Amino acid sequence: MANILKTIIENDKGEIRRLEKMADKVFKYEDQMAALTDDQLKAKTVEFKERYQNGESLDSLLYEAFAVVREGAKRVLGLFPYKVQVMGGIVLHHGDVPEMRTGEGKTLTATMPVYLNALSGKGVHVVTVNEYLSERDATEMGELYSWLGLSVGINLATKSPMEKKEAYECDITYSTNSEIGFDYLRDNMVVRAENMVQRPLNYALVDEVDSILIDEARTPLIVSGANAVETSQLYHMADHYVKSLNKDDYIIDVQSKTIGLSDSGIDRAESYFKLENLYDIENVALTHFIDNALRANYIMLLDIDYVVSEEQEILIVDQFTGRTMEGRRYSDGLHQAIEAKEGVPIQDETKTSASITYQNLFRMYKKLSGMTGTGKTEEEEFREIYNIRVIPIPTNRPVQRIDHSDLLYASIESKFKAVVEDVKARYQKGQPVLVGTVAVETSDYISKKLVAAGVPHEVLNAKNHYREAQIIMNAGQRGAVTIATNMAGRGTDIKLGEGVRELGGLCVIGTERHESRRIDNQLRGRSGRQGDPGESQFYLSLEDDLMKRFGSERLKGIFERLNMSEEAIESRMLTRQVEAAQKRVEGNNHDTRKQVLQYDDVMREQREIIYAQRYDVITADRDLAPEIQAMIKRTIERVVDGHARAKQDEKLEAILNFAKYNLLPEDSITMEDLSGLSDKAIKEELFQRALKVYDSQVSKLRDEEAVKEFQKVLILRVVDNKWTDHIDALDQLRNAVGLRGYAQNNPVVEYQAEGFRMFNDMIGSIEFDVTRLMMKAQIHEQERPQAERHISTTATRNIAAHQASMPEDLDLNQIGRNELCPCGSGKKFKNCHGKRQ
């Protein structure tokens, strides 16, 4: 039933008839545009932009805009888009994929939808697989866009943030897929809005769309955090400090299994790490290491919560079964803190600060389309994951290429012997040959064989894109022999040299079948472009990977019975069997990518929430007091609710400790202040007192701008720190739930549930840290420049505390320990001249 519906809904012939009618409407403007002067034609761009701003849709501008581009291309490039190219352009504008054969002019096809969508002023990204193609297409097609009055930018990895920003501000931006991804991630790590380089993702037109959205779909783009050596040192430093504490230096809340430093513990930390104030914004990272070291040393118990294996690894003990949980690690840096405690090697020190897969990157665009010569085989995946249809576009001229049936040999050796003989025979008559391989090693092997056979040739291994294009451009010349890995040279046409058509055109030889039919079709498509003659022939052996996986044993018996060790089997049935095997592999790969997406969707939803809130903070030109005060309120509520079932004395003591060490000035609240109050009244009492402390803290900042700056940096530093740990934790969770699949549990469902719980825990942790830092930070006039320093260098830089000079006539006994030192150093008195008392 599903297949019948699919046939009805996606009737390609009906779609092509509709596109032909739309293309005819574009052609009706041909004479009108041809009659315009250059200046009149260029002025159309301004006219279209104004019409769009006045409410006309891009769809209604399509016919005239496409006609303008056709005429412009004729005048500037000497190229006049065919009807099939106009049809392809319409498909691209509608956010789908036109399947256009190699040599049908995909680059020119793209100019029409790119121009049309650039009129909105929201930006168009033309995405390519390498920087050579970005620069080539931007240079060649940029000439047309610039002539028509649109700005064109090229985004390269080597460009500075300012240059990247300029490139993204252009109407049309050429870039590789990876650079767009990394720029997106980096934009969501900056502290200032002006340091972001991208605009909101609007329209992407992806060249070689199958390569980027299918083959590389699972590739994660990763921005790593602090380096391993630095973080490893911090774990050890924090552990050493925590081990030096006395029982009075920390407070344990047994019920919630939490631990924090007492006043004396804070004093010792500030002395040990030579800090002015442990809870300054600068020290977010260090407090995180100390918190974990406290938990590792005084809450997590050896042989109860974890064991140390013979391989010197920390293994978590399942509290219900008593068994160790292979592959599972504590999140949030706790596992590393335990490793430091037990003196075993610290693992996973390099953290992922941000990551995204291409699947989720490109699904963020408002509109996504792409071009390929071979997309129909992956149509189901394009539709399911990206909501994109694949529409085959007819060729401008009929395909003349002859595709021979596969030749199957018993061994790899006999196969390659036949390949070399075939190449040599064609070389001797002058017919150009392109030999496609699946691996660099195969290319080198065939190259040696051809050298021995006296056949001059070029080898292309996709190592140098600039050299690659030159070799591919010459591959259609008389007598040219080129060996290339399958992906090499995509995006560059092979044009036939003089006299080659009479010899049968370019012959493409495949040395084995790829597990994807699409890659084989791409290789075939190198020959027979734009109605040129050509041939394709695949050579297979029973020892090829694909044949080994599917049914080579039965065929092996046939070869042995017929004694055909050097001869080949050729039949259409064999070709069909190979394609059936490829379909099975493609199905497996599709299922794998789909499962990866299910996992990644959990991260995507969480990332979008964090990045949206982060963007709101960065771009806010307002006082963020309501947001911070709401965090303080929720933190108080969590703490009080977390002790609701405890005995009254224990509950009040725990809440009091929380208030004293995280919320209010030391000794400003006592047990008597809270006793006799209901939980609701306790929450309100603490919140009202906290608001006074908040007002006192911000009043120390010199002006409204300094307050905004302080609020932003405070929130962003905490969020970034916690988010980095959370990404790490999700990675570890994913590895762990994979093992649960063996216990009849659905790992994806478990990952979703556990990931959701961890996300909520992270939000609570963010709000707790923001509360603690806001209330306990020592704020002084130097706060603003301090806040702009980068957090990752904090703990290692705050080593030497210098002493400033003190007025001679001052009575030091009159100064409180936690007041600012009168010497003007900005430190607390106890950490400065008070040390001498």
From Swiss-Prot:
InterPro entries: Helicase_ATP-bd (IPR014001), Helicase_C-like (IPR001650), P-loop_NTPase (IPR027417), SEC_C_motif (IPR004027), SecA (IPR000185), SecA_CS (IPR020937), SecA_DEAD (IPR011115), SecA_motor_DEAD (IPR014018)
EC number per UniProt: 7.4.2.8
Any one of the GO CC terms: cell envelope Sec protein transport complex
Cofactor, free-text remark: May bind 1 zinc ion per subunit.
Keyword match Transferase: no
Membrane topology note: Peripheral membrane protein
UniProt-annotated location(s): Cell membrane; Cytoplasm
Binding-site residues, Zn(2+): 821, 823, 832-833
Residues that, per the record, bind ATP: 85, 103-107, 493
Catalytically driven reaction(s): ATP + H2O + cellular proteinSide 1 = ADP + phosphate + cellular proteinSide 2
GO BP annotations, alphabetical order: intracellular protein transmembrane transport; protein import; protein targeting; protein transport by the Sec complex
Superkingdom of origin organism: Bacteria
Top-level class of the enzyme under EC nomenclature: translocase
SUPFAM superfamilies for the chain: Helical scaffold and wing domains of SecA (SSF81886), P-loop containing nucleoside triphosphate hydrolases (SSF52540), Pre-protein crosslinking domain of SecA (SSF81767)
Primary localization class, coarse: membrane
Keyword annotations of the record: ATP-binding, Cell membrane, Cytoplasm, Membrane, Metal-binding, Nucleotide-binding, Protein transport, Translocase, Translocation, Transport, Zinc
SMART domains reported for this sequence: SecA_DEAD, SecA_PP_bind
UniProt similarity note: Belongs to the SecA family.
Role summary: Part of the Sec protein translocase complex. Interacts with the SecYEG preprotein conducting channel. Has a central role in coupling the hydrolysis of ATP to the transfer of proteins into and across the cell membrane, serving as an ATP-driven molecular motor driving the stepwise translocation of polypeptide chains across the membrane.
Quaternary structure and partners: Monomer and homodimer. Part of the essential Sec protein translocation apparatus which comprises SecA, SecYEG and auxiliary proteins SecDF. Other proteins may also be involved.
Name the UniProt record assigns to this protein: Protein translocase subunit SecA
Organism in which the protein naturally occurs: Streptococcus pneumoniae (strain ATCC BAA-255 / R6)
